[in-house]
Amino acid sequence: MGFGRSEDRVDVGTVAPHFTLPSQSGEMVSLEDFLGRKPVVLYFYPKDDTPGCKREACAFRDDYEQFGGLDAEVVGISSDSVESHRSFAENHDLPFTLLSDEGGKVRQLYGVPNTLGLFPGRVTYVIDREGVVRHVISSQLAASRHVEEALEALRAIG
């Protein structure tokens, strides 16, 4: 199984792979913590405090009330450390969970591709209450598009 090949990617209609990772507070968080209760917007991003990632995180922050109004949980994942996530969340007042995937095992599990073969990709999954992937957004450069499309997908699945 190759890393990030299209045939390895989690796609619409498939059950989202389960995982457990440490959050910015050091607490272990599992996808199962949300399933059965609320949909999850799971967004993979390249790196804390880079311009595009900061824009994307702040866009999720700015629309966080809309996600809450749709009873959805936003969760960000990158390979940065717990400490890096803590600082990133505090510096930008991020109200949602950031998970540390050091080593990239969950990124690989989801088949998130690298951009130009070098940089971790930017992919967002909208996962319904039952754990089924309902929408996938993949755009390295249009970070704010992830937020807009995730909200549209959540509205569509009700």
Predicted feature locations:
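Chalcogenol-based redox active-site neighborhoods
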Residues: 1-158
